[in-house]
């Protein structure tokens, strides 16, 4: 692929988000979603492997079906304006169809099955884009839908996704599938954050991107598709093992790591709104998902001790690069951020 084509697709994906965010009509939302999808498909097959082609076809089929439901829901809602007494009913049906279409595009439970299969067939780089940036257009639409009468349904989707993401990753040894279920769990928190307020949702999404992109980059460099392959690669990269282990603990939201701060923000909001049931379900899903985060971190930090390192370098005398040092310090800032936010005036 020409080096000039990739920036074109990236700019198109950014423009799709701007189109959705600046418009309040379902037609422009639909156009923005499809513009981002079509621009992302060439990035999926960047390395031209058969697995990537298969994953791209699955992704296209799901997105096309969801787009058709979205457009049909918009037409149903529009037809209600010309049908007198059933206006409200048709409008509600149309809004529900639009919401279900966006939920399917995002991969929220129970419409999450395609996410795991697609991510498993992708390289880590397009997989990272799929699980981070490609969520932005759908979340922008859901943020606008949350102002309607669909907030309770979105809360339900978010809670179910948090639980499914935790339970689905328990028996996984494939790193891509594990990251896919992790994304589903975090997506549940993101949707709940969008219902709570766009600023809370944006804050949580920013934290998730900051934490997940370095993990995808390290796994891409190590080319670790399986836990056993990851262990072999980490035996020659002791500093990577520390960074990866701490990164997974932070992604799981374990205090005092950076990922704990995002979950704390949402939980304090819902406890303040007396939505204790939502808080309990989200915490339960996080505690379940912490099991596989701890398993990977245990493999990286504890199992691969200094005596097992085969890099030929001294474990204790090796120096961290500036990037690694920054990421390690950032991951340890969770409790400091919580303490600072607690001191702010209410």
Curated annotation (Swiss-Prot):
Keywords: Electron transport, Membrane, Mitochondrion, Mitochondrion inner membrane, NAD, Respiratory chain, Translocase, Transmembrane, Transmembrane helix, Transport, Ubiquinone. It is a multi-pass membrane protein. GO terms for biological process: mitochondrial electron transport, NADH to ubiquinone. GO terms for molecular function: NADH dehydrogenase (ubiquinone) activity. One of its GO terms (cellular component) is mitochondrial inner membrane. The chain crosses the membrane at residues 1-21, 26-46, 60-80, 96-116, 122-142, 151-171, 178-198, 199-219, 242-262, 274-294, 320-340. This is NADH-ubiquinone oxidoreductase chain 2. It comes from Branchiostoma lanceolatum (Common lancelet). The lineage of its organism: Eukaryota, Metazoa, Chordata, Cephalochordata, Leptocardii.
